[in-house]
UniProtKB/Swiss-Prot annotation:
The keyword Membrane applies. The chain crosses the membrane at residues 22-42, 44-64, 97-117, 140-160, 163-183, 207-227, 261-281, 311-331, 366-386, 389-409, 423-443. InterPro entries: Amino_acid_transport_2, Hydroxy_aa_transpt, Thr/Ser_transpt_TdcC. It is a multi-pass membrane protein. Involved in the import of threonine and serine into the cell, with the concomitant import of a proton (symport system). GO terms for molecular function: L-serine transmembrane transporter activity; symporter activity; threonine efflux transmembrane transporter activity. Coiled coil: none annotated. It catalyses: L-threonine(in) + H(+)(in) = L-threonine(out) + H(+)(out); L-serine(in) + H(+)(in) = L-serine(out) + H(+)(out). It comes from Shigella dysenteriae serotype 1 (strain Sd197). GO terms for cellular component: plasma membrane. Its main location: membrane. It is found in: Cell inner membrane. Belongs to the amino acid/polyamine transporter 2 family. SdaC/TdcC subfamily. This is Threonine/serine transporter TdcC.
Length: 443
């Protein structure tokens, strides 16, 4: 083979889209589509049509640029097999490693608390409205559900991981089917409520405030950051040796872009379908009831007057069951990450990193007691889920997803080539706006 033929062959090989790229595209997409998506329509539809249209414009840039920034940070380490913790330690020393360990733990643990509240409220709503039984004691319901999940985790972890992987695509398909199924029930209420003469940009219910608060729920819902480190390591091992780091970065960006487009298409279609079926007033009521949008839809169809069609009855029960399955799936997935993070913190600070001083079984037991105990307390207290997301969950995710990569770009020599770009400003602004939600909630 001539030199020119070899170059053409190499270029063709480089430009080709591999099966593994498709697998990772779907993997990133599937990771993001979880229980958090069930709250996005409530916040997005809370302010009516114009704010959700603005969120539609922002959705893809937020999903793509923020995750690409995190991927670039993961790519910047000298070791192709090094995860994000090792990369941060390489750039900022042991202190940086401790910071990233804390960030990962506190980015995931509040999500468990959110899901603890959500699963309790969703089950109680289903019990009372769809099954028609008398209300149960909240503390008992939360304790029962958490003990049930603890039992499954303790005795069937491997089975749980397999079941979780199988549930991703049925859940995505269910969201799409429900979105399509709601089309016959669409109405013009959200359009009729648009009054250009009375629109306000500022103020408590102004467009800018609504979109600002919506950004935090987008950061929370459009989030596959927990898997980005593993994704980058996999792509570096696959591509970097043959094609170099720049090509690997472009390939990762391409995969993240396609995953983000899929995610935005599914979630925004679901949000618009819910909004056209309900109304901004219904979304406000769902927020006040502290339940996911599928539970509210189930109650909405349950309260329909006149003779209900078989389709409406099926949708009523299916919405609640899908919501419960989605929350269980998300809880299990985040529990594993929280357990790993807490085990690491206990080992690092309680046993000075010496794994020989404590057994894995003891570590898991200590971590489970703390995780389940704290989740039960929060579930019993029943704080507003959207407020919890906006004040705790989303800001911590934003600090990891947006601000840490931007700080690394400013400080790390291996990331110097990414300095001075407009997308860095965008990612930084998104991160700061999300974190500033804490200040807004306080005042």
């Amino acid at each position: 083979m001539s030199t020119s033929d070899s170059i053409v062959s190499s270029q063709t090989k480089q430009s080709s889209w591999r099966k593994s790229d498709t697998t990772w595209t779907l993997g990133l997409f599937g990771t993001a589509i979880g229980a958090g998506v069930l709250f996005f329509p409530i916040r997005a539809g809370f302010g009516g049509l114009i704010p959700i249209l603005l969120m539609l414009v922002l959705a893809y840039p937020i999903a793509f640029y923020c995750h690409r920034a995190l991927a670039r940070l993961c790519l910047s380490g000298s070791n192709p097999s090094g995860n994000i913790t090792e990369t941060v330690e390489e750039h900022f020393g042991k202190t940086g490693g401790v910071v990233i360990t804390f960030l990962y733990f506190f980015a995931i643990c509040p999500l468990l608390w959110i899901y603890g509240v959500t699963i309790t409220n969703t089950f109680m709503t289903f019990w009372e409205n769809q099954l028609g039984f008398a209300p149960l004691n909240r503390g008992f319901v939360a304790l029962f559900l958490l003990l049930l999940m603890a039992f499954v985790i303790w005795f069937g972890k491997d089975l749980m991981v397999k079941v979780m992987s199988y549930l991703v695509w049925p859940f995505v398909a269910s969201l799409v089917l429900i979105s399509l199924s709601l089309i016959p029930y669409w109405n013009s209420a959200v359009i009729d409520q648009v009054d250009l003469g009375s629109l306000s940009l500022t103020g408590h219910d102004g467009i800018l405030i609504t979109v600002w608060l919506g950004i935090s729920i987008m950061v929370f819902s459009f989030n596959f950051s927990p898997i980005v480190s593993s994704f980058v390591v996999s792509k570096r091992e696959e591509y970097e040796k043959d094609f170099g780091r720049d090509f690997t970065e472009r390939k990762c960006s391409q995969i993240i872009s396609r995953a983000s487009m899929l995610m935005v298409a599914v979630v925004m279609f679901f949000a618009f379908s819910c909004l056209f079926t309900l109304s901004p007033a219904n979304m406000a009521e769902a927020k006040a009831q502290n339940i996911p949008v599928l539970s509210y839809l189930a109650n909405h169809f349950a309260s329909m007057t006149g003779t209900k069609t078989t389709f409406a009855i099926t949708l009523e029960y299916a919405a609640s069951i899908i919501a419960l399955v989605a929350i269980f799936k998300s809880f299990f997935g985040h529990y594993l990450g929280t357990l790993e993070g807490l085990n690491g913190l206990i080992l690092k600070f309680g046993y000075k990193g010496d794994k020989t001083k404590v057994s894995l079984g003891k570590l898991n037991t200590l971590s489970m007691i703390f995780i389940m105990g704290s989740t039960w307390v929060v579930a019993y207290a029943n704080p507003n889920i959207l407020d919890l997301i906006e004040a705790m969950g989303a800001p911590i995710i934003a600090s990891l997803l947006c601000l840490l990569p931007m700080y690394a770009i400013r400080k790390a020599p291996s990331l110097a080539k990414y300095r001075g770009r407009l997308d860095n400003v965008f990612v930084t602004v998104i991160g700061l706006l999300t974190i500033l939600n804490i200040v807004y909630k306080l005042f």
